[in-house]
Regions:
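Structural preference for solvent-exposed beta-strand-turn elements
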Residues: 1-338
Length: 338
């Protein structure tokens, strides 16, 4: 293999794929990126056997070929190169030469034949959604995913597809996040899958503000084609808990508030929270919300926030982290809660 490529283009490609690589890889080959040069494209692939990601970037190919390169070393070298034009070539003994006009590195790789093959997906049953919409939906649910490994079924987000409706659900047992969006096409049947949190994080990292995402389902696997990258992941097996009985019916006590003002007030109150005294108190009066916090041996705070509300007075306590996670991910200037 022998190629010429711009440093910034190559570095961008490496950064797209290298995050899936585990720091505790069980096999040396899993610490490497598969680099394949063919048909005017450089294809970069990384996997930890549960999730795989690849991307293709433009390149000047003088000799096609393939090799696997240690990901961190590859990234560190490219990042520090002094020139923008980079030449990469390989020899039969898996030695890789990386050079610019004034700098040269020679490092060892591993044979591309040893790299695990990513699953192939049959065409058909593609679900399409705007990338910006999917990114918004993930932002409004991923914070509620459980990090408790003993509750494996909750370590991901439920994707529920019913005709032309996509619902995302996440819960850690203490809070529940649900969001619905309409798809541009109908699906033939109802589908439910649980996508692991690590895959969600990679999706969030690679989703763009423009363009479509295509979702394909395989045998206990899912593929997300984002155009600039393709992410393939195992799914979490099992049945997600029935969340609908947990969602309370509509309440007459509807409060409208400016999101940013409410967020900042909760953040300030949370400054006095401790592990033993976490709750922030919310007192709801007509057109006024009082956010307060009192912690023994620490201190207290009180702040008033203007709201639109004409109902009865309410006093309630919340873990401020749960409120902040929601408020910082919403985009609307004004929000309503019940």
């Amino acid at each position: 293999m022998k190629i010429e490529i711009a440093k910034d283009v190559l570095l961008s490609g490496i950064q797209k794929v290298q995050n899936v690589i585990s720091a505790r890889a069980t096999l040396p080959i899993l610490s490497n990126i598969l680099v394949e040069a063919e048909q005017g494209k450089l294809k970069l692939t990384a996997t930890d056997l549960d999730i795989g990601i690849n991307c293709a970037i433009p390149v000047d190919i003088q000799e096609p070929g393939a090799i696997t390169i240690p990901a961190k070393r590859f990234s560190d070298i490219i990042k520090e190169l002094p020139d923008n034009s980079v030449s990469i070539s390989t020899k039969k003994n898996n030695q890789i030469t990386i050079e610019t006009k004034s700098c040269q590195f020679k490092i060892m790789g591993l044979p591309y034949e040893d790299f695990p093959k990513l699953p192939e997906f049959k065409e058909g049953g593609v679900i399409k959604i705007e990338q910006s919409t999917l990114k918004e939906m993930l932002g409004l649910t991923s914070f509620a995913v459980s990090l408790d490994e003993t509750r494996y079924i909750l370590n991901g987000i439920l994707f529920k597809i019913n005709q032309n409706n996509l619902t995302l659900v996440a819960t850690d047992g203490k809070r529940l996040a649900v969001i619905d969006r309409t798809l541009t096409q109908n699906t033939e049947k109802t589908l439910s899958i649980i996508v692991p949190l690590k895959t969600i994080q990679e999706l969030n990292r690679n989703l763009q503000e423009e363009g479509e995402a295509s979702i394909l389902l395989g045998n206990n696997q899912v593929l997300f084609d984002l155009g600039s990258a393709v992410i393939i992941s195992r799914l979490i097996e099992g049945e997600f808990p029935d969340y609908q009985p947990v969602v309370p019916p509509a309440s007459e006590n509807k409060i409208s508030v400016y999101r940013e003002q409410f967020l900042l007030a909760v953040r300030r109150a949370a400054l006095l929270a401790t592990p033993d005294y976490q709750a922030v108190k919310l007192e709801v009066f007509k057109n006024k919300l009082v956010v307060s916090k009192s912690t023994p041996d620490i201190g207290e705070s009180r702040e008033e926030v203007a709201i639109e509300y004409q109902g009865k007075e309410i006093v309630i306590g919340f873990n401020p982290t749960y409120l902040i996670d929601v408020l910082k991910n919403l985009k609307e200037e004004k929000i309503r809660f019940e």
